[in-house]
Amino acid sequence: MIQPSTLPGMMELLPEDQLVFDTIKRKIEDVFIKNAFFSIDTPAIEKLDVLLSKGGGETSKQVFRIDNSKKNQGLRFDLTVPLAKYVSMYMQDLAFPFRRYQIAKVYRGERNQKGRYKEFYQCDIDIIGNEKLSLYNDAEIVKCMYEALKSIDVPEFEFQFNNRKILNGYFSYLGIDDFESCLRVIDKLDKIGIDNVKEELSKINLDASKIDTLLKFLEIDGTNQEIIEKLESLNIDNELFTCGVNELKFVYQDILSLGVNPENIKINLSITRGLDYYTGSVFETFFKDYREIGSICSGGRYDSLANNFTKSKLPGVGMSIGLTRLFYQLQELNLVKGKQTNFDCIIIPMKGYEKNAVKLMNDLRNSSVKCMSYLEDDKLKKKFNYADKLSVKYVIIIGQDEVEQNKFTLRNMENGNQELLELNEIIEKLK
C-alpha cells in the first residue's frame, strides 16, 4: 500500500484553511479589478529560451525542466517573463498602456527549507507601455498594492523603494564596472549582514576604500525628504545618478498624491531587487513589526524586458505578492481568522422528514441562502457534531412539531439559542 504524502514545498490545505486562502485571493483580485487591470492567463509550461531570456544564472538554477521532453521546456519561474512574451506576441491586438493582472501558480527549484516553496501562488499587476511609459505608473502600481494589502487586514507594512539608476550611477562614479554583481551582493545585505557583504564585495575585486565609500552611501537615512535632499547635495557628476534621483523624487511625490499614507512608504538605498531585468524604480514591502519575515510584496520598473522577443520598446512596471508564503506567515503569527465556512446553515431532519429537508433546502437556495441538508441516517448528536466541525453558525431542525406548525426551528450553534420561525423569517435572518 502506498503511503500518501505531499512533496515538500507544495501547498495543500484543509477545506477551512483553503476557504480563508481563497477569500484573501479574491479580495486581492477585487482590488485589481477595481483599479482597471485586465486578467490574463499564460501557460504554466514555456520554452526554456523564453524563461531564461532575462533571468541570468540564478534563474537558470531554479527553473524546473521537463525531463521527458527534448523540446527544452520548463515550468514558469514567475509571471513577468511570460508576460513579456505575451505582450510581444499580441501587441497589435492590445491597447497601450496595457494594464494586466494575473493570479496563478509558479514553480521554482527551491531547497527544502522553511519558508521556501516549489509551487506557489503569485498575485501580479503590471502596466506595459508601447515606446514610452510615464513614471506616474510606478506610483499607481504602489497605490494598487497598498489597497490590496489593506483589503486583507495584514499587520502594518512599509513599502521600501529605491531606483537602480541611482545605484548604477554611483557605481560608475566610483569606477565600479560590474554593476550586476554589486547589485546582487547588496541585495543580500538584510540576510547576511554588513560584514559578509564586505567580504563578498571584495571577492568581485572591489578595494577596501570603494567598499567603505559604497556602504556609507547605502546607509544614508532620515525622512524621505531628507534622503532626497542628501542625495541632491552630494553633487555627483553622473547623468545616470542624477536621472535616478529625479525619478525617485517624482515617484515618491506621486505616491503621496495618490493617497498612500506617508507612514507606509520609506526610501531605502540598499533596496536593489535581485532579478536582472529591473532598470529603474524597485520596491520591497515589509511588515513593520515582523521584519524577520522578509519581503511580502516586491517589483519595479523594467524598460527592456521584452527586447529578446521584439524590436519594439515595451517598458513596464509591476509588483507581485507571493501569496502562498504570505498566507503561511500570517497563519504562524495567528493573524488569519480561524475556522470559517462558505455556507449559511445546515438542515437537520428528524428520521422520516428527509423529503421536507430537501424541499426546504431548495426553497432556501432559490432565495440565495447557501445551505445543505444532512441526510445520513445518524444520531442527532452526530449531526450536530458535523455542523460544529464545519463551524456553521445556524442549524435548521425539521421534525413532527415543525411540520405540523409549518415552521422550522433555527438553532444558533454559537450560543445555543433556538427560535421557531416561518420560512420567510428564516430567509430574512440568513441572507
Curated annotation (Swiss-Prot):
Catalytic activity: tRNA(His) + L-histidine + ATP = L-histidyl-tRNA(His) + AMP + diphosphate + H(+)
Encoding gene, per UniProt annotation: hisS
Keywords: Aminoacyl-tRNA synthetase, ATP-binding, Cytoplasm, Ligase, Nucleotide-binding, Protein biosynthesis
Subunit structure: Homodimer.
Gene Ontology CC: cytoplasm
Family indicated by similarity: Belongs to the class-II aminoacyl-tRNA synthetase family.
This enzyme's EC code(s): 6.1.1.21
Chain coiled-coil ranges: none
Molecular function terms from GO: ATP binding; catalytic activity, acting on a protein; histidine-tRNA ligase activity; transferase activity
Organismal lineage: Bacteria, Bacillati, Bacillota, Tissierellia, Tissierellales
GO BP, one annotated term: histidyl-tRNA aminoacylation
InterPro entries per UniProt: aa-tRNA-synth_II, aa-tRNA-synth_II/BPL/LPL, Anticodon-bd, Anticodon-bd_dom_sf, His-tRNA-ligase, HisRS-like_core, HisRS/HisZ, HisRS_anticodon
Cellular localisation: Cytoplasm
Protein's name in the database: Histidine--tRNA ligase
Top-rank taxon: Bacteria
A Pfam entry, by short name: tRNA-synt_His
EC class name: ligase
